[in-house]
Amino acid sequence: MPKVVSRSVVCSDTRDREEYDDGEKPLHVYYCLCGQMVLVLDCQIEKLPMRPRDKARVIDAAKHAHKFCNVEEDEAVYLKRSEGIERQYRKKCGKCGLLLFYQHQMKSTQTTFIVDGALVKFGQGFGNTSVYSQKQETPKKVRVMMTKRTKDMGKFSSVTVSTIDEEEEEIEAREVADSYAQNAKVIEKQLERKGMSKRRLQEPAELEAKKAKMKGTLIDNQFK
């Protein structure tokens, strides 16, 4: 009969509550000025190399994963430069027809140029006439709390993990409400103590007043 060996692993963690930030998203979505989604990129546009001639950002397919969305092929344009003729195969927005990208080759090209100022991220006020005058809204920080509970069952142990997503404003509001409730309780107790002390001082005075009224003779009471 084969020998059976059982092993038990003890899991212990001094910190059962840990906080995790959502961090930077791996993919970035960019939109046309009209609000149409046109590009999904694995990094920010600002991190891409810039072409000095027209300040266009360069996407190298060998280095960055990307995908074009809702984009149509536009006509080829020939531009006269000092060193020769530059040929551009342009791509426009499928909704409004705005020039967004261009390439130097029609097919099987690794390089795509993003036209300067043609794309915006979500929340930068796309769809308005003045995009760069709009104030960018800062995303709300979400606090993620993870609670780990370990249950010992002899040879085996089970770990239960639960997460709670809370917005920072909700957490601050709850903390303020708790502090107000605690202050109200303290004030209520102080008022109760003051009321009891006043009663204790008033009771002897009332007794003395009653005793003073009871003093006197029967003749005085008859002529009252």
From Swiss-Prot:
Residues 191-211 have a biased composition (Basic and acidic residues). Keywords: Coiled coil, Cytoplasm, Nucleus. Residues 172-194 form a coiled coil. One of its GO terms (biological process) is endoplasmic reticulum membrane organization. It is found in: Cytoplasm; Nucleus. It comes from the Eukaryota. Belongs to the STEEP1 family. Molecular adapter that stimulates membrane curvature formation and subsequent endoplasmic reticulum exit site (ERES) establishment by recruiting PI3K complex I, leading to COPII vesicle-mediated transport. Promotes endoplasmic reticulum (ER) exit of cGAMP-activated STING1 oligomers. This is STING ER exit protein. It comes from Danio rerio. The lineage of its organism: Eukaryota, Metazoa, Chordata, Craniata, Vertebrata. The gene is steep1.
